[in-house]
Every structure is written in C-alpha cells, then in structure tokens.
Regions:
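Conserved hydrolase catalytic core segment
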Residues: 89-117
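N-terminal cap/lid segment of alpha/beta-hydrolase-fold proteins
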Residues: 1-13
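Active-site acidic short loop of glycosyltransferases
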Residues: 11, 21-23, 48, 84-90, ...
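Short, hydrophobic alpha-helix immediately C-terminal to the catalytic nucleophile
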Residues: 40, 80, 104-108
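Active-site loop/oxyanion-hole signature of alpha/beta-hydrolase fold enzymes
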Residues: 9, 17, 53-95
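Glycine-rich, phosphate-binding/catalytic loops in enzymes
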Residues: 43-47, 69-72, 110-111
Length: 117
C-alpha cells in the first residue's frame, strides 16, 4: 500500500507516495504537465517485488513550484534530496517523457546512487 505524504527535499516541499518496503527501490517519475498518479496502474504490479516511490516533481501536481525555470539538473538535485529524506541509498529510475530527462540528469550527476534506468 502506498502512503502519500509531503517531505522536504533540499528545501523543496515534495508530494510523494512510498510503499515503504522492499530491498530494492524503483522511483517512477512522470512527464511534463502530469502528476505521480499516471503510475497508478503500474504500482500494484511492482509493490510485491520492490519498494516503489512516486513523486510530483517540482512545479507539477501539488509539489512546490521553485520558479519559472525548472532545469533537469535542478530537478535531479531535488530527486537526490528526496532519496536522502526517504533513507534510500540507491534506486532504479523509470521516467516517462520529461521524467526520462530528469532520470538522465540524475544519472549524470549521481551515478553512485543509481541501480538502473
């Protein structure tokens, strides 16, 4: 069961949902003008096997807006802060559309925190 909550990630209020269990973790990142709810059909398929985290990236859903421009690198930094806030050392990132670009930026900046894309 996913638990929705707000966390602070590098000073940014993020709306996340976390299954909270599993040895491995998968982070699902939505696309432009979407929200974490686009993953609702996938979450039940994954949660028996892995910990699943979904997130409204900054400026989307009900997460905090940080300004007019949200670069992929800035969002990757916030994703690192999210992992830290949730106590997750490493994760596999799955991104749709813009979420894919955020995942690639995360890979470039924090390869040691990534299990896969």
């Amino acid at each position: 069961m996913m638990k929705e909550k707000f966390i602070m990630a590098d000073g940014t209020a993020l709306h996340v949902a976390d299954s909270g269990r599993g040895e491995r973790c998968v982070v699902l990142i939505h696309g432009y003008l979407e929200s974490m709810y686009v993953w609702d059909d996938f979450v039940p398929l994954l949660t028996p096997e892995v910990r699943v985290v979904t997130v409204d990236v900054p400026g989307h859903g009900i997460s905090q807006v940080l300004g007019e421009v949200h670069t992929m690198e800035m969002m990757a930094d916030v994703m690192r802060g999210m992992l830290d806030a949730l106590g997750i050392e490493r994760a596999t990132f799955v991104g749709h559309s813009m979420g894919g670009y955020i995942s690639l930026a995360f890979c470039a900046r924090y390869p040691e925190r990534l299990d896969g894309l």
